[in-house]
C-alpha cells in the first residue's frame, strides 16, 4: 500500500514523497510541517524512513506518527498527549495508570461522581424511605456506605472524604428544603414529597377535597347523633321526675331498666341458644330465625324522647322543647335537623350499625353468632353515657306500642 507525505516549502509549494516499498501490514504515515520563514538554505537533513533523504534544511519540525496496526485482537492503542510514544494494551487486562496522570488529578476525577447532584439523590432516597429522620442519621449512613466502598483509601484521605460527605449532605438537605421536598423542624427532618406538575397537583387536591368532605359528613353525623342522645336523655329525666312526683314514691325495683342496655327481640317460635361467660360480660346467642338488636338510644327514639328529630316529624312545640334541652350554641343545629337541611340524620331502625343490627336467616345458616355485652357495645357512642338516668317501664302504654305481642324480649 502506497503512503504519501508532504512538505511545505518556502515558496508555498507542496512536495510529495511516495514510498512504494511499504508493506500493507506495517504502513507508517508521517507528516512533517515547517514554518516557511525558518527555511534558510537547502541542506542535508535526515528524515524518517518513509521520506528517505532530502536536501532540505529544517530548523523546527513536528512529527505525528501512527504506529503499525496491532495484529492481536482485543488490543487498543494508548498514546500520550505529552510524548509521541505509543504502546498497545490488551482489553482483557486492567490498564495501568497513565504515566502522565498525577495522583491529584485522579482523585479529582473520582470526586466528580460524588458532587451535589449525586448526594442530593442519595439524601432524597434516604429521607423518602425513612419518612422522618435527622441530619446526623443520614450523614452517618452515607459515610458508612462510601467508606465501605473506598476501603483502600488512606486514613488521611478517608477523614477528608467523611468531612466532604457531611458537607455535601448538609448542602443537599438545604437544596431539598428550598424545593419544598422536605421540611425541617429543629433537628427533625420530614419527607413532604417530590414536586409534581399542575395536573397531578390539581388531581391530588381534588382527592384531598373529597376526603375532607367525607370526614365533614361523618363529623356532622356524629354531632347530630350526640345531639339526639342529649335530647333523649334529658327528656327521659324530665319524664321520670314527673312520674315520681305523680306517684309520690320511687318506682318499684322490678319496673326499672338501667342504662345502658341492649334489647334482642324475635318471634316466639324462634329457638334461642344462649351461652354466658363466667364474668357475665359476654353473651353468645344462636338463633334459628331472624331477630333484631336495639340499643337504649334506639328504644328512646321509638318512645318519642328525641322529639321526632330522628324521623323529620318534629312539630313546632317539639322543636321548642328540643332547643331548650341543648346548649345555646347547638340550637341552630337542632333547627336544621328539624327542617331536614342536614343530610344523613334519619336512619332506619334495626338497620344502622350504630342504632341496631338485623341479621337474616341466611346469616344464621352460615353460622353467624352474636357476642353481646352489658356495656351497650352495639352503640357507637356508649362513651357519652356515664351516670345516665333510669327508665321506668311496665305501666306506660308507649312500651306496648313499641313491641308487638308476638315478640318476646331478652
UniProtKB/Swiss-Prot annotation:
Pfam families: DP, E2F_TDP. CDD domains: DP_DD (cd14458). The lineage of its organism: Eukaryota, Metazoa, Chordata, Craniata, Vertebrata. Component of the E2F:DP transcription factor complex. Forms heterodimers with E2F family members. The complex can interact with hypophosphorylated retinoblastoma protein RB1 and related proteins (RBL1 and RBL2) that inhibit the E2F transactivation domain. This repression involves recruitment of histone deacetylase (HDAC). During the cell cycle, from mid-to-late G1 phase, RB family members become phosphorylated, detach from the DRTF1/E2F complex to render E2F transcriptionally active. Residues 204-277 are annotated as: Dimerization. This is Transcription factor Dp-1. Residues 113-195 bind DNA. One of its GO terms (biological process) is regulation of transcription by RNA polymerase II. A motif (DEF box) lies at residues 161-195. Residues 211-327 are annotated as: Enhances binding of RB protein to E2F. One of its GO terms (cellular component) is cytoplasm. InterPro entries: E2F-DP_heterodim, E2F_WHTH_DNA-bd_dom, TF_DP_C_sf, Transc_factor_DP_C, Transcrpt_fac_DP, WH-like_DNA-bd_sf, WH_DNA-bd_sf. It comes from the Eukaryota.
Amino acid at each position: 500500500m502506497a503512503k504519501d507525505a508532504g512538505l511545505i516549502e518556502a515558496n508555498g509549494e507542496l512536495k510529495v514523497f511516495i514510498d512504494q516499498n511499504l508493506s500493507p501490514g506495517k504502513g507508517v504515515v508521517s507528516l512533517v510541517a515547517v514554518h516557511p520563514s525558518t527555511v534558510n538554505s537547502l541542506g542535508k537533513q535526515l528524515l524518517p524512513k518513509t521520506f528517505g533523504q532530502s536536501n532540505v534544511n529544517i530548523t523546527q519540525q513536528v512529527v505525528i506518527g501512527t504506529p503499525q496496526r496491532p495484529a492481536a485482537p482485543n488490543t487498543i492503542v494508548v498514546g500520550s498527549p505529552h510524548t509521541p510514544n505509543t504502546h498497545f494494551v490488551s482489553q482483557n487486562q486492567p490498564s495501568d495508570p497513565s504515566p502522565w496522570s498525577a495522583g491529584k488529578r485522579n482523585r479529582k476525577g473520582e470526586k466528580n461522581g460524588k458532587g451535589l447532584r449525586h448526594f442530593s439523590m442519595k439524601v432524597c432516597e434516604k429521607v423518602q424511605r425513612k419518612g422522618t429522620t435527622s441530619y446526623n442519621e443520614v450523614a452517618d449512613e452515607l459515610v458508612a456506605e462510601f467508606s465501605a466502598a473506598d476501603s483502600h483509601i488512606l486514613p488521611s484521605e478517608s477523614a477528608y472524604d467523611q468531612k466532604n460527605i457531611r458537607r455535601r449532605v448538609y448542602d443537599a438537605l438545604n437544596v431539598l428544603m428550598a424545593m419544598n421536598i422536605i421540611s425541617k423542624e429543629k433537628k427533625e427532618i420530614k419527607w413532604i414529597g417530590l414536586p409534581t406538575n399542575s395536573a397531578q397537583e390539581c388531581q391530588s387536591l381534588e382527592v384531598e377535597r373529597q376526603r375532607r368532605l367525607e370526614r365533614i359528613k361523618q363529623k356532622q353525623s356524629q354531632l347530630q347523633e350526640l345531639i339526639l342522645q342529649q335530647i333523649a336523655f334529658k327528656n327521659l329525666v324530665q319524664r321520670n321526675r314527673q312520674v315520681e312526683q305523680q306517684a309520690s314514691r320511687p318506682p318499684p325495683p322490678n319496673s326499672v331498666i338501667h342504662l345502658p342496655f341492649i334489647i334482642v327481640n324475635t318471634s316466639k317460635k324462634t329457638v334461642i341458644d344462649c351461652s354466658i361467660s363466667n364474668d357475665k360480660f359476654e353473651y353468645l346467642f344462636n338463633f334459628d330465625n331472624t331477630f333484631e338488636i336495639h340499643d337504649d338510644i334506639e328504644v328512646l327514639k321509638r318512645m318519642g324522647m328525641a322529639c321526632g328529630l330522628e324521623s323529620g316529624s318534629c312539630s313546632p312545640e317539639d322543636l321548642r322543647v328540643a332547643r331548650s334541652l341543648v346548649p345555646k350554641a347547638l340550637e341552630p343545629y337542632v333547627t336544621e335537623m328539624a327542617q331536614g337541611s342536614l343530610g344523613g340524620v334519619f336512619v332506619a331502625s334495626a338497620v344502622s350499625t350504630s342504632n341496631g343490627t338485623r341479621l337474616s336467616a341466611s346469616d344464621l345458616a352460615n353460622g353467624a353468632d352474636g357476642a353481646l355485652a352489658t356495656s351497650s357495645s352495639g352503640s357507637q357512642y356508649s362513651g357519652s353515657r356515664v351516670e345516665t338516668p333510669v327508665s321506668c317501664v311496665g305501666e306506660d302504654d308507649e312500651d306496648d306500642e313499641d313491641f308487638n305481642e308476638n315478640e318476646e324480649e331478652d
